[in-house]
Regions:
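Acidic, negatively charged sequence tracts
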Residues: 1-194
């Protein structure tokens, strides 16, 4: 899994007035949870663009006053009107313990059912998984090259393909399916009448 580097500096004082002063300077107040202690720090707002404005999931390598921490993005707060970053929470990740994270689902191949007039529906865009930091994939790929109209790929089928990951979504949930469109149903009825 890709990692993004964010450099921060510790905050001396924590409070509404100080957080507002940081935001005026283009800095974002942040907190790192999950380690031995909570670390309050601030970072440049521009450092968060590759982390937030992407469909991909990344781990974060934080450097706060010379110390490095592995983390994941826990929560982001935006301003209600102008959509500027207000606050970012990070969760410290221990490399020896499994973590739960949402991984994007990608689709590869062309479904024969789509060529016959069906419609491809991606029902799950991100799947929750549990794995060690070193085993996290960039995405979960779904091969749809054998999907006919009315067929789907379920979580339990993907779990069989990825035995090293624990997929936390319900096993009977359809991730990707090909459904019949009105035009394809009409064509099938017309062919049946002949």
């Amino acid at each position: 899994m890709k990692s993004i580097f964010v450099s921060g500096s510790p905050r001396e004082s924590v409070g509404k007035k100080d957080a507002k002063a940081l935001r005026v300077k283009g800095l974002v107040p942040c907190v790192l949870y999950g380690g031995d202690e909570q670390i309050h720090f601030f970072a440049n707002e521009k450092d968060f663009k590759p982390l937030l404005f992407t469909p991909e999931t990344h781990t974060v390598e934080l450097e706060i006053s010379g110390k490095k921490y592995n983390a994941i993005l826990q929560d982001v707060q935006y301003h209600a009107i102008n959509d500027r970053l207000l606050h970012v929470d990070f969760l410290h990740v221990d490399e020896s313990k499994p973590l739960v994270i949402a991984i994007p689902v990608t689709v590869s191949g062309i479904a024969p059912g789509v060529r016959e007039g069906g419609k491809l529906i991606i029902k799950v865009r991100k799947m929750k998984i549990r794995a060690l930091l070193s085993q996290l994939p960039d995405n979960i790929n779904v091969d749809i090259s054998k999907l006919e109209i009315g067929q789907s790929v379920k979580v339990e089928q993907l779990q069989a393909l990825h035995p090293d990951l624990a997929l936390l979504d319900a096993p009977n949930v359809a991730v990707v399916s090909v459904t019949a469109t009105r035009a394809s149903r009409q064509a099938a009825q017309d062919e049946g009448k002949k």
